Amino acid sequence: GASANDKWNDLQISDSSIKLKLSKNISGAELRKEISINENESVIYQKHTFTGGEGRIPVGHHLMLKIPNKAFISFSDFEFAGTPPQPIESDSSLGRSVLKYPQNVTDLNLMQRFDNKLVDTSVYPFDTSHEDLYMIISKKDMPFGWSAVSCPDQGWLWYSIKNPDVLPNTVVWLSNGGRYY
């Protein structure tokens, strides 16, 4: 979409922050982005603001993490995690998915593979050469939701805090070299 692919114009740049405005409107709405850091913190703050416009649009954000060895994935309380109706890679000549599609679980330690064996998807990687996807549905009436990935061997932790009333779902795309194109 436009927010990922169109030009962002600088509004204000300092040593610790940048404010940008998307060059195109989305459904008539102006979109501004602010990214900032604070001295002596290892946190990147990000905020997007829509002004004006009409209608509804899907909103979300995503990150890409390079996991060199082993990582642990966790979330705030959730209703369930579900895979879509079809595998990400259903043509074995193009790629490989290992999770069962569709399925809903309440424990990431107990997801099913395509062969009905259980796999712990809270530890990554849980298999080799695969592309898989599941969505976390947040519990309602929570003041905030969070996602975290820790990589103790590398000494880092990534986390995100969100308002589950605004962003009720979290999509987890597990890309581990499972595409052959």
Where are these regions (language model features)?
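Extended, loop-rich substrate-binding clefts of extracytoplasmic carbohydrate-active enzymes
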Residues: G1-N40, S74
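Residue-level marker of positions within ordered structural domains that often coincide
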Residues: D15, G53, Q154
